[in-house]
Amino acid sequence: SSDMHRNRLVHSYPVAPTDTFHIRRVLFEGIDPRDEKWLTQISGLKENSLLTVKKLQEAMSIVIGTNLYSNVSYKLVGERQEDLVLTVQEKSNSAINVGLNFNSEDIVALLLNATFDNRARYHSKFSVTGRIGKRMYGRVDYAIERNPLRNINLSYMFTYHDLDVYNRGDKIVNTTYRHHFVELGYSDMNWLNFKLKLGARYEYFDYNSFLYTAENQKYQVKPEGFISYFAQAHLETLDRRYFPSKGVSLQADYSIYTDNFVTYKGHTFFSALKLSFLSVLPLTSHLSLLPSIDGRVLIGKDPAYPFLNVVGGDMPERYLPQQLPFAGINRMEIFDNSVAIVRLNLRQRIGQRHYISLIANYAIHEDNFFDLLKGESVWGGSIGYAYNSMFGPMNTNFGLSNRNNNLQFYLNLGYSF
């Protein structure tokens, strides 16, 4: 967690990591009594057992890694000092947040968020988020927590989109539409670094205009609603979101789309499988190699326009949830129903906050997954500079690909949202 350096691990007297002592009881101070069971479970601490200092420090790191506590300390008490007491200080999750982002595509965007954490019998959390910019949205989230790592959540989001779609570097269509999104989900993070989420969604796409700039009007689009079911699994050990220095991220998403809970347009539903993998391999103290793989496959007949594969930009999900990043293509382009992307990012850190990145990536896409290796190949790359400021990342890059003829330029100031 990026917050781990702000937490304190405290013990009452100096000891060696290999020292072993007997623990008769494990006690907690400063937490809700209902959380003791799962906290004992994930920490691995057991009563009436032998414990090394190293194992104790690992258990405390796990507690800190939940990101629920601002301070964690321990002490040994009792006549023989056999009672282990862990004292924690819970974080307050009620907050008001403001974000500001400047970039060369959207120009400026403002994000406002208010979160209220209600620590009643059943922990619940309510938040309201709004974004102002070329892409505007309002979102309301409500979650009930069975324990801090398991929750049932209900969300509603309204988005106004003004999207430009490109093909081989040329804009082919501009579309404006309103997107209504409702989600009911269950999240389970009881496994260390692993999150599982299951649920159902309703989405309605209310298209306002669909303006082609080319003669080929390939996509026939009308307002349409979808009922979908999804499962997501995410393994995350990256030490921070931006400029990670170690760890891996592996994410798998599978969604089934219908228009009546069961079928789509009178035939079998269509579905989408998405996989993303990123690893950070330190070569020296300042030089790292970041290999990544992204892929998405649409399965079934007549996949709907709002869920087609789109590629482009320097980060995933920039404009649409299914968007895959590709260095050398700045704008969003529609690809075939099966897409795979391999990327290598060689990143050099200069000093503490400056980074130079050299990225090469290769994509292949084809409508039929079993013919993917016969599909169209796309090559691209970029060179970029970034500064990790206290206000968020500031980065710029220049890119090229065989999908367009022009040098691509992108500038970003601040966290992306």
Region annotations inferred by a language model:
Residues 1-7, 13-14, 156-159:
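Post-signal-peptide, soluble extracytosolic/periplasmic N-terminal scaffold domains
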Residues 12-20, 85-92:
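Conserved "repeat-terminator" motif of extracellular CCP/Sushi domains
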Residues 33, 49-242, 311-325, 332-340, ...:
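Gram-negative/organellar outer-membrane beta-barrel architecture
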Residues 34-48:
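N-terminal periplasmic "start-of-domain" segments of outer-membrane beta-barrel proteins
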Residues 36, 40, 56-60, 274:
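Extracytoplasmic/secreted envelope proteins and their assembly/folding machinery
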Residues 65, 95-98, 226-350:
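C-terminal outer-membrane beta-barrel translocator/porin domains of Gram-negative envelope proteins
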Residues 85-89, 347-378:
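C-terminal hydrophobic structural anchor segments
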Residues 192-194, 285-287, 352-354:
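Secondary-structure transition into beta-strands, especially the periplasmic turns and strand N-termini
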